[in-house]
Structures are given as C-alpha cells and as structure tokens.
Amino acid sequence: WILDPAGRWKTSTRVALLRYADNGSGYFGHERRQVTQELEWESERWLFRVGGTAGRIDFEVQTVGVGVDLPARLADDYTAELRLERRLNSRWSAFSAYNWERRRSNDPIASYRVNEGLLGVRWSWER
C-alpha cells in the first residue's frame, strides 16, 4: 500500500500459513502461522524501514518433558527490524540496522532472545 501521493510512504502486511512435512516418521513436521507488518519511507537518497513479525509453530510429533501423555512442542516467534540506509551513489550505500528476535517455547532449551546491530556498506550491481 502506498500511503502518500508522492509514493514515499509504503506499508505491507503478509499473513502466512506454512506446513512442513518430512518423508520419514514426521518428527520434523510442523505448521507455522505468522503475520508480518512493514512500514517504509524512501526518498532519493534515504531509506527508512521498520517492521515486525509474530508467529506460532506447532510441532506434530515432537513433545516436551518426561513421562506419559506429554504436551506437543510449540514455539512463539517475534522479530523486529529497524533500518536506515543512505545512498552514496548509483552503486554504493551505507546502512545501519537493528534486529531483535525472541522465541518463547514450552521447551526451555529452545527459548532465546537475540539483539543484533549492524553497520556497513553495500554495493549493488544494478543501476
């Protein structure tokens, strides 16, 4: 979606349902549901993007715990991105980005948080 007449502000929403199956016992089979939202502002020299994703993974065969009648493994995934990019010329740009990720699961070993900061330059072969 373009949000302004000049076309500088854009937004997008994606909803996905993915089903993964293996060709064996089904141990790696799972279903992922997720929604992604992004907002972007772009000018001749600058690009600013912010976005996030929320999703859930339900495993079909994998369980959590010890004992009888174990619950199926599940995971909730959340991500966020913040990016600022400056075009230096037709091929080079400099950027700064921050990415955050969190997974919550009923399996404590599979739960984590990640914070990532990036600073770099990028070369493009497109003109």
Residue ranges and their predicted role:
Residues 1-127:
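Gram-negative and organellar
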